Amino acid sequence: MSRGLELLIAQTILQGFDAQYGRFLEVTSGAQQRFEHADWHAVQQAMKQRIHLYDHHVGLVVEQLRCITEGKSTDVDFLLRVKEHYTHLLPDYPRFEIAESFFNSVYCRLFDHRSLSPERLFIFSSQPARRFRAIPRPLAKDFFPEKGWEKALNNVLSDLPLRLPWQNKTRDVGYISAHLVETLGEETLRHSHLQVANELFFRNKAAWLVGKLITPDATLPFLLPIHRSDDGELFVDTCLTTSAEASIVFGFARSYFMVYAPFPAALVEWLREILPVKTTAELYMAIGCQKHAKTESYREYLYYITSTDEQFIEAPGIRGMVMLVFTLPGFDRVFKVIKDQFAPQKEMTAAHVRACYQLVKEHDRVGRMADTQEFENFVLDKRQIDPTLMALLLQEAPDKITDLGDKIAISHLYIERRMVPLNIWLEQVEGAQLRDAIEEYGNAIRQLAAANIFPGDMLFKNFGVTRHGRVVFYDYDEICYMTEVNFRTIPAARYPEDELASEPWYSVSPGDVFPEEFRHWLCADPRIGPLFEEMHDDLFRADYWRSLQTRIKEGHVEDVYAYRKRQRFCLRG
């Protein structure tokens, strides 16, 4: 092939990425209008559309390249020259880091995720020292309380691009000011100021103002969720100023923000100061660059695996009937492989399981479902696999394992944040911690249901506890939409003997769910049963679930709060 062809291919890939990110920004830029018009269903559709854009544009580029090369095979030297030309296009490119990930995706689509090596792919960044280039305008604006904090806060709210009237701006400014005084004290505030991002962060039914509260001693988060009333008026729902609160808002179990970010690396770097525990991958994920977040996540994994002598082991917890889960003892993620054969009671296919995971990726996760990254032909060094785990992999998923000599390749797996399984957590805690966990579990079920998600298998083992004590669902093989379920009350027994029979005295059809049965496995522990009955007894009634279904079918979209309801200004004393 002509040497000029390599440059043409490199340019075609970069132009394809330009087109993809342009559409990404176009969809994102509509977030403000969707919020102002309260078009919540359009919010959900835009979220799915934006996720699909990436793979769609990768596919378009792949088809272009097949036409350009006329289907001829390409040798290794040719591919290396394509990457070299592509690398030379990036030094002055404003989104070079995501462009590298796009190149990787095109390569993997062309070559079916095979022959993946640092020479052919951007497994490591071509410009590791350059996080981002100079940008044409600042990301944020400073506000100083020269005439008092209430005046400064009024200026912050007045400066927003939102075109709706305020319900009561003076009231909200008073709430925020009082919260800052209560949290930091007047003396500290006298020597502090705000730096507020120019772009709002939209998600669900809220527009988030994201800023930094810069004090003499520290830089703190300054987050204001702005909501729209049914009358079309704006109000601030709360003010969050701790790193823990900010971490939850930007958490891995939440949908991606819609924030206009033509220079994503610069925004990630700006956010890092108020989200110090978040990795680079998590920050890119939060702003919707999920494919590049996958690249960064893999780099974080490579950094860890090359600096430890730990071995992969089976993950703690009850072994699943569908997934084989393993981890590294000191790593904060788990690796999930779909088994070749499922337990008899799991009447489903691997394709169904993958569809469930994709549903979660595209759906509003409401802070209650863990995000995942999907990998193909994932290579592990045999020396770093515990023999017991190796035997288990070969027993449960032999069709997915390829022996490469001193390594193995797993044809398909998911990587997910590691949490403490809820069943283990409940065994270890007492008192207030136990009560909080049961309250959190019930809240998770309610919020998932309100978002039109029924977990299917509600056993404690299918949920995890995060470092912030939040309960998150992570076992998706039986997940379905609430509207697909037939919630029924168990009919009264005809005779006393019916209740002692091994088979039910009533008919059961596919899709039937009897909430009364939840009590048998959720309340069996005498420490847990009374707490569950006190806080969540309505979960055992079919009419509760049917009422949620009615609201969903009527088009109602529930509010989702990334903080405790007691923190809302409208509920404070």
Curated annotation (Swiss-Prot):
Gene Ontology molecular functions: [isocitrate dehydrogenase (NADP+)] kinase activity; AMP binding; ATP binding; phosphoprotein phosphatase activity; protein serine/threonine kinase activity
Q: Which domain of life is it from?
A: Bacteria
Reaction equations catalysed: L-seryl-[isocitrate dehydrogenase] + ATP = O-phospho-L-seryl-[isocitrate dehydrogenase] + ADP + H(+)
E.C. code: 2.7.11.5, 3.1.3.-
Q: Where in the cell is it found?
A: Cytoplasm
UniProt KW keywords: ATP-binding, Cytoplasm, Glyoxylate bypass, Hydrolase, Kinase, Nucleotide-binding, Protein phosphatase, Serine/threonine-protein kinase, Transferase, Tricarboxylic acid cycle
Which residues does ATP bind? A315, P316, G317, I318, R319, G320, M321, K336
GO CC terms of this entry: cytoplasm
Q: Which Pfam families does this UniProt record tie to the protein?
A: AceK_kinase, AceK_regulatory
Q: Which InterPro entries match?
A: AceK_kinase, AceK_regulatory, Isocitrate_DH_AceK
Where do the catalytic residues lie?
A: D371
* GO BP annotations listed: glucose metabolic process; glyoxylate cycle; tricarboxylic acid cycle
Q: What does this protein do?
A: Bifunctional enzyme which can phosphorylate or dephosphorylate isocitrate dehydrogenase (IDH) on a specific serine residue. This is a regulatory mechanism which enables bacteria to bypass the Krebs cycle via the glyoxylate shunt in response to the source of carbon. When bacteria are grown on glucose, IDH is fully active and unphosphorylated, but when grown on acetate or ethanol, the activity of IDH declines drastically concomitant with its phosphorylation.
Q: What PANTHER family does the entry give?
A: ISOCITRATE DEHYDROGENASE KINASE_PHOSPHATASE, PTHR39559
Query: What family does this chain come from, according to its entry?
Result: Belongs to the AceK family.
Checking NCBIfam families in the record gives: PRK02946.1
This protein is called Isocitrate dehydrogenase kinase/phosphatase
| Organism the protein comes from | Enterobacter sp. (strain 638)
Q: What is the lineage of its organism?
A: Bacteria, Pseudomonadati, Pseudomonadota, Gammaproteobacteria, Enterobacterales
What's the gene?
aceK
